[in-house]
Amino acid sequence: MAKQPGLDFQSAKGGLGELKRRLLFVIGALIVFRIGSFIPIPGIDATVLAKLLEQQRGTIIEMFNMFSGGALSRASIFALGIMPYISASIIIQLLTVVHPALAEVKKEGEAGRRKISQYTRYGTLVLAIFQSIGIATGLPNMPGMQGLVMNPGFAFYFTAVVSLVTGTMFLMWLGEQITERGIGNGISIIIFAGIVAGLPPAVAHTIEQARQGDLHFLLLLLVAVLVFAVTFFVVFIERGQRRIVVNYAKRQQGRRVYAAQSTHLPLKVNMAGVIPAIFASSIILFPATIASWFGGGTGWNWLTTVSLYLQPGQPLYVLLYASAIIFFCFFYTALVFNPRETADNLKKSGAFVPGI
């Protein structure tokens, strides 16, 4: 029976409709994320907080604010961002390697993956509560920031903790919905949206500087070329892969005979993707932020020294950041690609690699 051309058109049309729905869902979710980043925690003076963030330019707090899409500078319910979830993911994935019970759960396939995801949610809740308590108790005690909290007390602490924890758990749920109903990894998309939220104002400010003559046009052109070149290089590396030739011998199943086939096993150059950089940022941000919040308290002056050493650009920060990225590159690649498991699967399917 001849294949009708109209069927291909209907199939393609249905595929485009599904893609459109997924894109619209992602756009809608990001709009909700941006709206939520403007909903403030009750009881905080936004003008005093803006002065605080102005004093913290170039510090770890500004970096934390960037990851939250500016939510921290507005004392938003999304101020914690998605970082507690990332930290919990790191802890759970490390435990799956060193803890035999979790290692067995991981081998259970889809059911095991759901259990691991559930454990990650519990870990996110615990870390979010811990971090929100730290922020709620640290804000009223920050030196030189009198009036930041209008009415400090139990009511403010309770409201702030509930708001921050709820915001983080909602972002985690939103990221999972984007992964399921949208396109790509939802958590990565939320992080990306938070980072690029400050891009349009920065571009507009740069163009205005060039228009007024404060910035030379050739320098602006050079920056644009560098941005394009870096983007091209990142995409080139991300799409790069090593193709291992895999052959299937002639085989018979029942009455059907399958001819010998040759295909390839694609191994990405960068299997870990951007995950190591995100994990490394999360690992450094957590202690540095705690040190920055509590460093001004009595008896906690040593935390101020720690926070200064962990500022972006400091030698210790660069060393720890680079070391963490290298570690998570190896660690995450070992998680997503198991050579022994891949070899067993190839053997079970009757495939072999020539010369091995």
UniProtKB/Swiss-Prot annotation:
Alphabetized UniProt keyword annotations: Cell membrane, Membrane, Protein transport, Translocation, Transmembrane, Transmembrane helix, Transport
Q: Which Pfam families match?
A: SecY
Regarding the membrane, this protein is recorded as: Multi-pass membrane protein
Q: Which GO terms describe its cellular component?
A: plasma membrane
Q: Which biological processes are named by the entry's GO terms?
A: protein transport
Question: Chief subcellular site?
Answer: membrane
Under InterPro entries, the record lists: SecY (IPR026593), SecY/SEC61-alpha (IPR002208), SecY_CS (IPR030659), SecY_dom_sf (IPR023201)
The organism's superkingdom is given as Bacteria
Membrane-crossing ranges are: 24-44, 77-97, 125-145, 154-174, 183-203, 217-237, 274-294, 317-337
**Keyword Nucleus annotated:** no
Q: Where in the cell is it found?
A: Cell membrane
Cross-referenced NCBIfam families: 3a0501s007 (TIGR00967)
The Swiss-Prot or TrEMBL record describes its family as follows:
Belongs to the SecY/SEC61-alpha family.
Matching PANTHER family: SECY/SEC61-ALPHA FAMILY MEMBER
The entry's function note states: The central subunit of the protein translocation channel SecYEG. Consists of two halves formed by TMs 1-5 and 6-10. These two domains form a lateral gate at the front which open onto the bilayer between TMs 2 and 7, and are clamped together by SecE at the back. The channel is closed by both a pore ring composed of hydrophobic SecY resides and a short helix (helix 2A) on the extracellular side of the membrane which forms a plug. The plug probably moves laterally to allow the channel to open. The ring and the pore may move independently.
Quaternary structure annotation from Swiss-Prot or TrEMBL: Component of the Sec protein translocase complex. Heterotrimer consisting of SecY, SecE and SecG subunits. The heterotrimers can form oligomers, although 1 heterotrimer is thought to be able to translocate proteins. Interacts with the ribosome. Interacts with SecDF, and other proteins may be involved. Interacts with SecA.
Protein name as it appears in the record: Protein translocase subunit SecY
**Species in which this protein is naturally found:** Buchnera aphidicola subsp. Acyrthosiphon kondoi (Acyrthosiphon kondoi symbiotic bacterium)
This protein's gene is called: secY
